[in-house]
From Swiss-Prot:
Main location: cytoplasm
Enzyme class, broadest EC rank: hydrolase
Site (Discriminates between blocked and unblocked aminoacyl-tRNA): 13
Sites annotated Stabilizes the basic form of H active site to accept a proton: 96
Alphabetical list of PANTHER family matching this protein: PEPTIDYL-TRNA HYDROLASE (PTHR17224:SF1)
Keywords tagged on the record: Cytoplasm, Hydrolase, RNA-binding, tRNA-binding
Active site residues according to the UniProt entry: 23
Keyword Cell cycle included in the entry's annotation: no
Protein's name according to its UniProt entry: Peptidyl-tRNA hydrolase
Catalytic reaction annotation: an N-acyl-L-alpha-aminoacyl-tRNA + H2O = an N-acyl-L-amino acid + a tRNA + H(+)
Family to which this protein belongs: Belongs to the PTH family.
Localization annotation: Cytoplasm
Amino acid sequence: MELPIRLVVGLGNPGDKYTSTRHNIGSDWLDRLADAQRVSFALDIRFRGLCARIVQSDTDIWLLKPQTYMNASGMSVGAMCRYYKITPEQILVVHDELDLQPGIIKLKSGGGTGGHNGLKSIVADLSTQVFWRLRIGVGHPGDRNQVVDYVLHLPRREEAALIDEAIDHSIQVWPLIARGNFAAAMQQLHTRQEN
């Protein structure tokens, strides 16, 4: 058992035109968690983001959707961590992952940024790569020159269905993640996808 999660960050770009795009999958995931927990987001200018609070096992857990655009997400995350004295090991960042097929979700701690500007910004602000990531597969366009256009568009219908199903399953696994029972959470997330 590791430290419980105290901050969940859903990466995405602000504005209606980005809603449900591949790059906003993290933000969309956080909306689903907030709905399941029956909480609403409110803008908090201290953290440059939309925030909500849930309580799990007597622990306050903050939900944060940075409103800074992806490449400045670290400012929002860092501000909240400093204010609430949250360590990097207590953070879960939910983001789109080009290296995973739609419908695949992987949980891991640390690692590189894979070129993801939101992760780069968070790593730069926290001065560490050691935080938890929930990587939601969106697939790859096959040509790195098409990545920017690809992530800023909606997934195809069949991809969206796979992503939705995987998100639903990961929300069911959320209590394990929140408590810091990452081994059990990974087993449930990763084993299901191999079947």
